[in-house]
Structures are given as structure tokens and as C-alpha cells.
Amino acid sequence: MREVRRLRGEVGRAIFYDDLEREFKEYLRSQPIGLARPEEIQYALENPDGLIPPITEEIRPLPPNFHHELAKFKVTISDACISCGLCVELCPFGVYARPEGLNKLLPPTSANCIGPLCQEKYPDHYCVDKCPTNAIAIEREPTYELLGDPRWTADLLLATYKMAETGRAPEHLEYRVGASGGGFDKIKFTFESWRVHKSTPSPSLLRGRGEPRGEGTRSHEPSTAIPLNRRPWGPKIWIPVPWYGGGMSYGSVSLQTMLSRARAAKAFGTFVSTGEGGYPEALYPYDDHIITQIATGLFGVREDTIQRVRIVEFKYAQGAKPGLGGHLLADKVTADVAKMRGSVQFSSLFSPFPFHSVYSVEDHKKHVDWVRATNPRALVSVKVSTPNDVDMVAVGSYYAGANIIHLDGGYGGTGAAPDIAKKNIAMPIEYAIPKVHKFLVQEGIRDELVLMASGGIRTAYDIAKAIALGADGCVIGTAELVALECNRCGNCERGRGCPFGIATTDPELSQLIAPDWGAQRIINLFHAWRAQLIEILQELGMRSILELRGRVDVLEYIDEMKDH
């Protein structure tokens, strides 16, 4: 007999994961539903009113913040080296360098080395074989084995570092998936079958979205833009990429980290959330790209901060710890954080689990109406975790007047949430997306809501898979911190625990992150992700990321493939 665990409050019904997986497999075998409207796709392609903002910053390669860059391979040069410089000429990856006027080589940049793959793909450039004195050796870097976990593998961490440095995906590292054995790691795109049938129109094209494009007609880059308001009223807001930054409050991360994220969001024409810790004045120049969050603790919530922004988010629950409320331990509550939150310095802060003023959809609607009365130009987002009845929650938020439903599954968060909560309470996001998408279609309201997904979104491929399952876009967080060289050590809850100055409020450690450096690293990562999304769309013969929504026919479940 299976053990059933009930969580008081949000998860009103127990979740049986075997049942969820069975329903999920059936969904992947079903016909696509809830596809985007033709006129919306056409708008994304033409941008007639100029609502889709341009991306204003280009890739600018940036070195890591610290002298010792983590690497997968270690390159060593023995005393047998005669400094002939042949390796400098041969290596196309910049591992070796000898400044003009010097006879000696500089120490090799091991992080640029692609290891044995070089011998396989570029034998004429493989330094180990070409060195006249056999002075070069390449071996696995010992610290590589200590990095990461099954969800964020060492390869995925290093690949994200490299994309944040160069704006391009590294060929020698696995940057698409992790090794968790579940979640998005068990889902793959069926590119091979689509390459065979490229002349066949996709279902979205057959619904009148234009003629299918062959190889010779793909002259324009696919659009990655999505709308954030599908209601017939309210401001029409588009973002040029299908993601924005999730809530990380002042206190959970440093002000420098918040500034880095805000500047990157502005450069990419998208948004980033303040989290529940208030709205620091340093973010005021980025008002048009900020989402201010109203959570159950109401920390730092003021009418003037609601009036500053274009999107206001109600956080009813967090996928990493649903039913537990927000936690900020005493170490991180410095004088500035306490002032922002209206609390006492070095006292732990706990948000209650529910809004004690909301016990029905009608109460929820009063919240939404309050925001609209305070700021008529703001869109309203509702962030919920993923209980078994999350589909009903989403419909309730629709009737309360929300523009955006933000589903937050388990495995999200920076590391401060208890592991037992992250791994055992919320429904995984890949199960929640189809459940909500399908129910909204059945209710006839899918084309009036924007469905954003978060909770373990690590890569551009995760974003694309979430959209193919039925989401409109994704909300990201940890990946941005990894771009700032987070190594996922898990010390986020401590005031001086983060050695990189990311998730800390210590005034000295915070200075390790220069906002301009951090912003450009995130911008570079975003460029790499967008390029990967464009490649995915081109492989599938799609003109817009909007065409990918609900297209489960381009996905395959890895367990299913093993069965055949």
C-alpha cells in the first residue's frame, strides 16, 4: 500500500507520482491542443506597432571574476618544452599564448581546452600529438569531479560559465540537459523525424499560419518574442525572449546581484522580479523592467512601489517550499535589509504561508482590484506552486482578473529552501504545465491567459520543452546566478556563506560582484540561449516560438523510447 502524505493548506489532495507520470505519458502521445492564434504569430513576425522592444546590448566576452577558472580538463607542459610556439599556432581555442617579445609560453588556459574531442574532430590541431618534444599532457581536472549534482551537473555548470563568458555554447560540454534521470532530462526533441518530414506542414501551419518554409526559403530569423497580456483590456506588453527573471529579494541576494539582473533585463527588453523583500531605490532607473512582488509577509510593500512598475506579482506560494512561507534567517537581516522590510536587525523573518485576507476567489479578486486601483497600467501576475489541483487554482486566478499565471514547480530556488521541501512537496513543473494548459483549453480561456513556468529551468532546451508542453514562457533564477559564477555550494541561507558575493548581504563580500560585469555575463548567457532557441525552431521548421506552444508531437519521453 502506497504511503500518502498530505500537506495542510495548499496541497489539499495527496499527489501520487505514478499517476502523474502515467497521465504525462498519455499527454505526450496525444494530439497538440491550445496552439497559438495565427494573428498573434503574425504580429510577432511583423511587430507592426513596435511593441516588441529591441535587444540593445551585444555579446561582449568577459573573463571570470576569479583568477583560477574552473575547467573540465587540465593541460600541463613539462620541462621538455622548448617554447617553439607550435602549440600557439595550432590551437584554435586559445589554450596557449606567448606574448610578443617573450620566449616563454604563458601558463595554459585549461578552461578553453576541449580535451579528447579535439583529437577526434580536429586531429591536425591536437597539441599532444603535434608537440615535437611530447611536453604536453591533458588529463581530467580533479576539481571537476567535485562540482555539481545530478540536476546541475559539472558539465552544465561549466557550460553556463562559458556561455556567460563568450555568449556561445561550448562544443565539449553538455549544455542541454543534466543527469537527474527525471524532469526535463527525460524529455528530448525528435529532431531526426522532423528532418525527414520537413516538407510536411506542421499542425500550426495547417491552421492558416502561412506556408511551410523549405530549406531554401528560410531567409528570416524565427521570432522569439511572446506577449505578456492576452486580455482585451490593459497595456499590451511584449518581450523579445520567452523568459524573465524570477523573484530574488533584497536580503536573499546582494544589491549588486539585483542590479546585475535588472541591467540585463533592461538590455534584453524583458523583466526581473524584486522578490518579496521590497523595492530598493537603486532599482528605480529600471522601473519599466521590474516586477514588484507582493507576498504574504507584505515586506516593503508600498503604494509608490506598486505605482512604479508595469507588472505586479502576487506570490501565493513558492514551489521550493509550498505551505512553509518565506524564510530569511537572522544572519542576512542587516540594518539595510531590516529598514527595507520594516523589521528588526538580525532577527529571522518568516512570511506566513497564506494571505490571511484571502480565503476564496472573491478575496483573491479584491487583491487584484486593489492593485488595479493603485496602478491602472499594471499587469497582474499570480505566482502559485503546483498542488494536485493547480489547474483549478489557475482558473480561479483567471476569473479574479489575472493576466499572467506563474506556475512554480519543485526544484527551484537558490539553495536556502530545505531539501526535504524542494524534493517532496510540489508537483514537478513538467507535470504541472500540461495539467494547467489542458484544463485552460477545456475551459475555453487558454487564449486569454499567459502561462509562465519556473522551478528547475536551467537551459534554453528546458525553456523550449516547457513551451512545447503548453507554457508560453519561463521564469528563471538560478541560471542567472550560475552566470555570475555560483557553484551551487548551498550556503545561500547564511549571511557570509556565499563566497562569490551573490547570495549574501555582507557589505564586503557583496563588492565581489560589479553590476556592470554581472549584467554583461547574464546578457552573454541570454544571447547564447536565444541562439539555441532559434536553432531549435529552425530544426522544427517554425517561424516563431509561439508556434511551439503545446506541440507535444515534437517531444519524446526517454523511457518510452527504451520500450521500443
Region locations from a protein language model:
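Glycine-rich phosphate/ribose-binding loops and adjacent secondary-structure elements
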Residues: 1, 69-73, 83, 88-89, ...
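Conserved, well-structured core domains of diverse proteins
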Residues: 2-74, 79, 95-111, 128-203, ...
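Electropositive phosphate-/nucleotide-binding environments in soluble metabolic enzymes
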Residues: 78, 85, 121, 125, ...
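Secreted/processed peptides and extracellular or luminal domains of membrane proteins
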Residues: 87-93, 97, 119, 124, ...
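Aromatic/His-enriched, Gly/Pro-containing loop or helix-boundary segments
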Residues: 105-123
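Glycine-biased, low-complexity coil/linker segments
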Residues: 207-211, 215
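Active-site cores of enzymes that catalyze phosphoryl transfer or operate on phosphate-rich substrates
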Residues: 313-366, 373, 388
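Anionic ligand-binding catalytic core segments
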Residues: 509-528
